[in-house]
């Protein structure tokens, strides 16, 4: 998704905070809300905040909203974090590769398996790579990911956006809801400071417009966009 946002960005450099123990003064109201105290993670747009710190900061995010929007979900479902429609393992693997390659140039962390997954040494090699922080993909998954990566990099608007000197990637955003006094959070894939564009990179099993449109609603990406809309408009 590429959307134009209106935000005067003041960035907070949080690259030195790499573990949750670096921010153990976060004050969270476990029962009534999701408030991050003034001595914890600051409200604003963070550059370099680790994914661990972002995920451990208890605040309302898009996943919570997507789960809450489904009337069949109880609070137990929401707390367990299983309200989302499950993404197939293969689709998730492709998405991880595309995200890492396009936004972070980390293609080297993914390898292609040339045999079948039924071979005994597939799992053994998968575990070996996991210990090194790498991921093993099947030949079909790897080739599908390469096709998606090439499509993004060959897109003129995306090429302009990714290469722009004012584009900042992997931002963590925390804001306070003025009505309900709750902390909201979002982790944006990339934001262009100069032009006010926000990008969230999504992969889909098919690029056919009708299939992609259905997937957007099936996986609650429309609600995720609405969550970002609250942040920035």
Can you name each region flagged by the protein language model?
Residues 164-233:
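Mg2+/Mn2+-dependent nuclease catalytic core
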Residues 2-185:
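Metal-dependent nuclease catalytic cores that hydrolyze phosphodiester bonds in DNA/RNA
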């Amino acid at each position: 998704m590429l959307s134009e946002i209106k935000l005067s960005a003041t960035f907070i450099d949080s690259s030195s905070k790499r573990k949750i123990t670096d921010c153990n003064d976060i004050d969270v109201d476990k029962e009534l809300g999701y408030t991050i105290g003034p001595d914890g993670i600051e409200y604003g747009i963070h550059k370099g905040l680790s994914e661990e710190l972002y995920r451990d900061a208890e605040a309302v995010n898009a996943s919570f909203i997507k789960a809450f929007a489904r009337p069949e979900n109880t609070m137990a479902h929401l707390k367990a974090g299983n309200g989302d429609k499950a993404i197939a393992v293969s689709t998730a693997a492709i998405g991880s590769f595309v995200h890492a390659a396009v936004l972070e140039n980390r293609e080297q962390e993914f390898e292609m398996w040339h045999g079948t997954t039924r071979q005994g040494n597939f799992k053994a090699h998968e575990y070996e790579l996991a210990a090194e922080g790498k991921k093993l993909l099947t030949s079909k998954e790897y080739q599908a990911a390469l096709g998606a990566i090439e499509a993004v990099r060959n897109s003129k608007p995306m090429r302009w956006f990714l290469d722009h000197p004012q584009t900042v990637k992997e931002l963590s955003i925390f804001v306070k809801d003025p009505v309900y006094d709750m902390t909201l959070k979002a982790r944006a894939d990339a934001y262009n400071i100069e032009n006010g564009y926000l990008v969230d990179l999504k992969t889909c099993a098919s690029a056919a417009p009708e299939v992609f449109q259905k997937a957007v609603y099936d996986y609650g990406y429309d609600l995720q966009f609405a969550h970002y809309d609250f942040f920035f408009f």
